[in-house]
Amino acid sequence: MKIRVATRGSKLSLIQTEELLAQIKAVEPDVQFEIVVVKTTGDLIQDKPLFQIGVKGIFEKEVNLAVLRGEADMAVHSLKDLPSELTPGLVLAGFSKRAPPHDVLISRGGYTLETLPKGAVVGTSSVRRAEFLKAVRPDVEVKPLRGNVDTRVGKVLSGQYDAAVMAAAGLQRLYGSSPPVSIVPLRVEEVPPPPGQGIVVAVVKEEDSWLIDLLKKASDKTAAIEATAERAFLAGVGAGCHVAIGGVAKLTPQGSLEFTAGYAAGGAKYVVKVFGEDPVEVGKRAAQLIAEVRQKFKQRD
């Protein structure tokens, strides 16, 4: 059996793809894979922040098209890059074991959010990260920083930026236990991560039941439950990358969910916790609370 796998061609994308394929191989040892590399709009446009490009699903549409056109059997993505609604005819069908979902502050000097010097230049092109940073440290300068993980790390190492905010998952997958920069975790209450961060997923045609069944066997159950809650939250808030909203679910050893969600704007932030058993209901409740907060912010302005 051979499965054609569409993915972006960056080093991190290929590492993430291999991670998910290893889970499939563990349940179906005889399966073979053919990698189909796809260039996306997000890969090609590097001189603008993502929210300024104005294309939804900037890292996923072209990759998923390879599946719809029959050029690949499945597409592999970082779940955080997928919009709440997939292209008709496609479904989410496989979930990797989750890497740490939180963001981190990287620097040469081992800075924390508290010890960053006044006026320090901090890089990120994420509206979410920028707004939460401004709420916590209004005295630092937030500047756009695009590029793959190596590029962003390199700009910190070269001194172009004093620090940058990035995903822990990408750094861990790329550098393992030997990163070239200091890494300080940011609590999810400080900077709530985007829904799906740390999870790698497969997207397939909804009629390919044989592949859906295989991916279900290979999926990490904890990641699938957390992803379900976070996707319900994402659908509920209905906001793209131009709004500073984050949300992350954590499955407890007792089997219940703890959901942390946040919104930031105008130098202020609001974070809420929701607890429950049903992933969809927990995600919807968190979205409802954040929607209420956004409305209050609008009324205040």
From Swiss-Prot:
CDD domains: PBP2_HemC_archaea (cd13644). Keywords: Porphyrin biosynthesis, Transferase. The modification S-(dipyrrolylmethanemethyl)cysteine is found at residue 241. One of its GO terms (cellular component) is cytoplasm. GO terms for molecular function: hydroxymethylbilane synthase activity. One of its GO terms (biological process) is protoporphyrinogen IX biosynthetic process. It catalyses: 4 porphobilinogen + H2O = hydroxymethylbilane + 4 NH4(+). Its cofactor is dipyrromethane. Its EC number is 2.5.1.61. Pfam families: Porphobil_deam, Porphobil_deamC. Binds 1 dipyrromethane group covalently. It comes from the Archaea. Pathway: Porphyrin-containing compound metabolism; protoporphyrin-IX biosynthesis; coproporphyrinogen-III from 5-aminolevulinate: step 2/4. HAMAP family: Porphobil_deam. Belongs to the HMBS family. Tetrapolymerization of the monopyrrole PBG into the hydroxymethylbilane pre-uroporphyrinogen in several discrete steps. The porphobilinogen subunits are added to the dipyrromethane group. This is Probable porphobilinogen deaminase. It comes from Pyrobaculum islandicum (strain DSM 4184 / JCM 9189 / GEO3). The lineage of its organism: Archaea, Thermoproteota, Thermoprotei, Thermoproteales, Thermoproteaceae. The gene is hemC.
